[in-house]
């Protein structure tokens, strides 16, 4: 029984040692795939649409007496100068409705 346990441990260590170099080789590929995905997401953000409205913004904004026009975009995340006023769906993916 001890022999079986030792052989199993040696086999697992050998498999783990063989798997680590494969994982190291995959890291550059994963980094390239991540970069490509990030560029696609940036491209998708370039396809945002803008919505402008002056008085129909929301009741809380009207209560503040704001009369300036708002520009809103549907994005994955809002910029630091924008506020999230809910969600919107673009091509079946939910995003934030960000207004300036």
Curated annotation (Swiss-Prot):
Disulfide bonds join 72-99, 74-88, 78-98. Its main location: secreted. It comes from the Eukaryota. Keywords: Antibiotic, Antimicrobial, Cytoplasmic vesicle, Defensin, Disulfide bond, Fungicide, Immunity, Innate immunity, Secreted, Signal. Expressed in Paneth cells of the small intestine (at protein level). Residues 1-19 form the signal peptide. GO terms for biological process: antibacterial humoral response; antimicrobial humoral immune response mediated by antimicrobial peptide; cellular response to lipopolysaccharide; defense response to fungus; defense response to Gram-negative bacterium; defense response to Gram-positive bacterium; disruption of plasma membrane integrity in another organism; innate immune response in mucosa. One of its GO terms (cellular component) is extracellular space. InterPro entries: Alpha-defensin, Alpha-defensin_C, Alpha-defensin_N, Beta/alpha-defensin_C. Pfam families: Defensin_1, Defensin_propep. Residues 20-68 form a propeptide. GO terms for molecular function: protein homodimerization activity. Proteolytically cleaved by trypsin at Arg-68; the propeptide is stored in the tissue of the small intestine and the mature peptide is found in the luminal fluid; cleavage may occur during or after release into the lumen. The N-terminal propeptide region suppresses self-assembly and renders DEFA6 propeptide unable to agglutinate bacteria and protect human epithelial cells from bacterial invasion. It is found in: Secreted; Cytoplasmic vesicle, Secretory vesicle. Host-defense peptide that contributes to intestinal innate immunity and mediates homeostasis at mucosal surfaces by forming higher-order oligomers that capture bacteria and prevent microbial invasion of the epithelium. After binding to bacterial surface proteins, undergoes ordered self-assembly to form fibril-like nanonets that surround and entangle bacteria and thereby prevent bacterial invasion across the epithelial barrier. Homodimer. Self-assembles into higher-order oligomers termed nanonets, fibril-like structures that entrap microbes. Self-assembly into nanonets seems to protect against proteolytic digestion in duodenal fluid. Interacts with Y.enterocolitica invasin and S.typhimurium fliC/flagellin; the interaction creates an anchoring site for progressive DEFA6 self-assembly into nanonets. Belongs to the alpha-defensin family. This is Defensin-6. It comes from Homo sapiens. The gene is DEFA6.
